[in-house]
Amino acid sequence: MPEAQDTVPRTGGADARAREPLRSLARALFDRVDTYFDAAFGARANPWRLLGALAWYLFWIVAATGIYVYAAFDTSAAGAYSSVERITANAWPLSGLARSLHRYASDAFILLTVLHLAREWAHRRYAHVQRFAWLTGVALLLFVWLSGIGGYWLVWD
C-alpha cells in the first residue's frame, strides 16, 4: 500500500530556501544588516526597518523643494538650462541650497524606495492582507519613475 502523501503545503524551512534561493539570500542579507543596525540604534530606532517611512519623509522634502525651485524655473526649451544656472547662483534666497537638497533628496528617495521594495519582497510582505499596500506601492513606483524622468528632462541639458 502506498504511503499517504503530505497534504500540508510546505511554506517554510529548508524546503522554501531550496525553492527560492534568491529570496532566501536577500532575506538573509536584510536580516544580517538588521542585526548590525539593531546593535547600533536599537530595534525601535533601526533605520533599516524604517525604509518606507524614511522614503515618505524624503518624498515631502522633494515635493517642497521642487515647488520652491519650480517657482524660479523657466520651462521653455531655450531658457531652462540658463534658469538652472541662475537658481544655482542664488537667484532667490537659498535657491541654490533648495536645488541641491531637491537633487540629493530625490536620489536618496529612489534608493530608499527600491531598498524598501526589495526588503518587503524578501520578507514576503506582499500577500494576503498586505496585497493592497503592495499593489499601491508598485503603482507609486511607476509614478515616481515617470516623475524622475520628467525632472531630468526639465533641465534640457
Question: Could you say what each language-model-derived stretch is?
Answer:
Residues M1-D157:
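Membrane-embedded alpha-helical bundles that constitute the cytochrome b-like, heme-associated redox core
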